[in-house]
Amino acid sequence: PPRSTRKESSAASDVYKRQGYEGPLYAEISPRTFSVLVRSGSCLSQLRLRRGPAVISDNAMQQLQETTGLVHGGETLDIRDGVGLSVNLMPDEKSGMIGWRARKHAGLIDIDAPRSCAVNSFWERLTEADLVAGGLVLNPDEFYILASREFVTVPQGYAAEMRAYDTRVGEFRAHYAGFFDPGFGMAELGAGQTRAVLEVRSHDVPFLIEQGQTVCRLVYEPMAERPNALYGDTTSTSNYQSQGLRLAKHFLQD
């Protein structure tokens, strides 16, 4: 069965589209934080087609972890219905940052214009000074960009999907655009340590998120065949390879 999600670049700008409609293909575009300019031909979604059982078992993911190394950098490995990923709130050694918080009433984003928006016009930097008792308070309906504590690798014969952690645990949602392509974070392609970017939003009440708290799960799926191009290879322009706190490609970020 097919499965659709937002492109990472539109997700990291907090643009949400509903799925589930059967019939002629439409997209409901609902900006939550920034106003966006789209036009005929603008690319907001991506589609994966699956044949038969798609998700590999936890045992198979454990074997891949032992032979290939799917994630590293966390204190413990939690594989239950996918590989658990936790949030990193330790300040970056160079920038001192722990994340980004979207500004309200910011300008317009042209969805087809990469590197066209000044970061400071749209985002506030979060540092250790923003922590409360070692945690970060997520305010209702504000949008945050954080990073996983773990470094992630997707082997060439697999793809991965990041799924929200059990929504019964906590009133927040982490990561809306969940597709990871083969080659993501692969050292063989020259990638450095690559974290997963987490798009996080609290719902109705303030929510305290703490260092190392599990926020989502990464589920690996076998590819029908090895793709001709891998994420981050010399033929691609990959915005998130070797990433830390990486914003969408529309922003002028070093």
Show where each model-derived region lies.
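Single conserved hydrophobic/aromatic residue that forms the stacking wall/gate
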Residues: 1-12, 16
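Compact, glycine-rich, soluble single-domain proteins
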Residues: 10, 132-178
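Extended, regular secondary-structure scaffolds
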Residues: 17-22, 50-53
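Short, structured beta-strand/loop micro-motifs enriched in basic residues and often containing a Trp
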Residues: 22-30, 124-127, 192-200
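A structural micro-motif recognizing beta-strand termini
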Residues: 29-33, 90-91, 147-151, 165, ...
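Helix-rich terminal scaffold detector
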Residues: 36, 42-122, 171, 175-254
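Conserved, ordered domain cores of eukaryotic regulatory proteins
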Residues: 102-132, 137-149
